[in-house]
A protein has these predicted regions:
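FAD-binding core/adjacent interface of flavoenzyme oxidoreductases
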Residues: 1-5, 62-146
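Glycine-rich Rossmann-fold phosphate-binding loop(s) that bind the pyrophosphate
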Residues: 8-11, 127, 148-153
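Helical element adjacent to the flavin cofactor pocket in flavoenzyme catalytic cores
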Residues: 62-73, 189-201
Length: 202
């Protein structure tokens, strides 16, 4: 019996687990994620943070989906190391999970703000459903915000501020938003759109 371990429960990890179960019905499949819920639509979490969507439409799979397919789902589990010689995944709780085949499907993560107190209360990074919940909770009580980072996640933050009626300064390292991809004229169109919802590019 083959033991498969998948680190990451995004769309890649979840789809891999589903395909493995179809192709190898007798195998053992374990999916490990450091998040607190099963697969959800990451694109829609900004709509939740805006206050426009409840949680239900964002979820894609519930825990029952994994149970029905005999897939062992480990939530809130951090992988601390992988011993490729022994073929063992080690977790933060000291558990050793053996594997015959391992898939690392963790995806990317946003750059953390490289300053002291970047994890203080009221400072948010925007990537997970948990992040979106915290942003929504704080946004509903806030009057002023600051956005750091002139990329796609930053523009999502700007949209959240606009939807929640929060005036915000948008701090950008360069002279315009997404300077690597947009012309000056294109960026200015985006800047004007931000200003219309109360977000000022700086």
């Amino acid at each position: 019996m083959t033991q498969y371990v998948i680190i990451g429960d995004g769309i890649s990890g979840s789809s891999a687990a589903e395909t493995l179960r179809e192709e190898d019905p007798e195998s053992e499949i374990t999916v490990i994620t450091d998040e607190g819920e099963p697969l959800y639509n990451r694109i829609l979490i900004k709509e939740h943070a805006k206050g426009k969507l409840p949680e239900a439409p964002i979820s894609i799979h519930d825990e029952e989906w994994y149970d029905e397919r005999d897939i062992d789902l480990s939530l809130n589990t951090f992988v601390t190391s992988v011993d490729t010689d022994a073929k063992v995944v080690n977790t933060h709780e000291g558990e050793e999970i053996p594997y015959d085949k391992l898939l690392v499907a963790t995806g990317g993560t946003p750059t953390q703000l490289p300053v002291d107190n970047s994890d203080a209360d009221g400072i948010h990074h925007f990537w997970t459903f948990q992040d979106a919940r915290a942003i929504r909770e704080h946004a509903e009580q806030a009057n002023k915000g600051v956005i750091v980072g002139a990329g796609l996640l930053g523009i999502d933050f700007a949209a959240v501020c606009g939807a929640q009626g929060i005036e915000a300064d948008y701090l950008m390292r360069g002279d315009r938003w997404w300077r690597y991809a947009l012309s000056g004229k294109g960026a200015e169109i985006m800047h004007e759109g931000m200003r219309e919802v109360g977000v000022e590019p700086v």
